[in-house]
UniProtKB/Swiss-Prot annotation:
It comes from Pectobacterium carotovorum subsp. carotovorum (strain PC1). Residues 178-224 are annotated as: Disordered. Belongs to the UPF0441 family. Disulfide bonds: none annotated. This is UPF0441 protein PC1_0312. InterPro entries: Biofilm_formation_YgiB. Residues 209-224 have a biased composition (Low complexity).
């Protein structure tokens, strides 16, 4: 009986250790799992043109040019459009706007859009370049615009077509952004009035500040 009792006690101790370690192992696994899920940021570089990119990355001159040209095409489709040059200049400044075909109205056939007039859009002031989403070997790009008027909430800064702000319009900067920043923006389907894009930028600025504040508060709470 004594031998049986000793064996039972040993088995109990092993089971107790196993049950006690299991939650710890699960907690550690959960931390690594969450860390993997949260890696949704991408390191990107901001350039004003392909030459700036090539100078900073001599071995990637071809990729720099391709990304720049693709960004120009994206800008034509997604940039804010204005019915008049005056409205565009009021938001982006003198010599910062160019004429472009009027945006295709949603739901209308492309043939019916031909000869439908012209509109005005800001010149592309730079572009964002980063790795393709999904970890591919290629690069993704995003056109950037930069208002040159003191009244604009993004004066002298890089913003994308959605109005999201990426800081000073300085070429060669590297920063971390959500991977969604490199996702293609929807094509513009209507013109906006003077001040309309500025309002969009102001809303985005407010959202970015709120998000940064929430992240900071969360970090402080986790830090104890």
């Amino acid at each position: 009986m004594k031998r049986t009792k000793n064996i039972n006690q040993e088995m109990f101790r092993k089971e107790w250790r196993t049950h006690r370690l299991a939650p710890v192992a699960l907690a550690v696994s959960a931390v690594f799992f969450l860390a993997g899920c949260e890696q949704t940021d991408e390191t990107v570089s901001l350039y004003q043109n392909a030459d700036d990119c090539s100078s900073a990355n001599p071995s990637m001159a071809a990729q720099c040019t391709t990304a720049y040209n693709n960004a120009l095409k994206e800008a034509e489709k997604t940039a804010p459009k204005y019915a008049t040059k005056e409205d565009c200049v009021a938001e982006f400044g003198e010599a910062q706007c160019t004429q472009t075909p009027a945006p295709a109205q949603a739901g209308m056939a492309a043939e019916s859009q031909q000869g439908g007039g012209m509109s005005w859009m800001p010149l592309m002031a730079g572009y964002m370049m980063g790795r393709m989403m999904g970890g591919g070997a290629g690069f993704a790009q995003q056109p950037l615009f930069s208002p040159k008027t003191p009244a604009s909430p993004a004066n002298g800064q890089f913003v994308d077509a959605s109005g999201k702000n990426y800081g000073n319009a300085t070429t060669g900067r590297t920063m971390t952004v959500p991977k969604t920043a490199l996702a293609p923006k929807p094509a513009t389907t209507s013109t906006i009035t003077r001040g309309g894009f500025g309002e969009t930028v102001a809303k985005q600025n407010s959202m970015q500040r709120s998000s940064a504040s929430s992240s900071s508060s969360s970090s402080r709470s986790m830090g104890g």
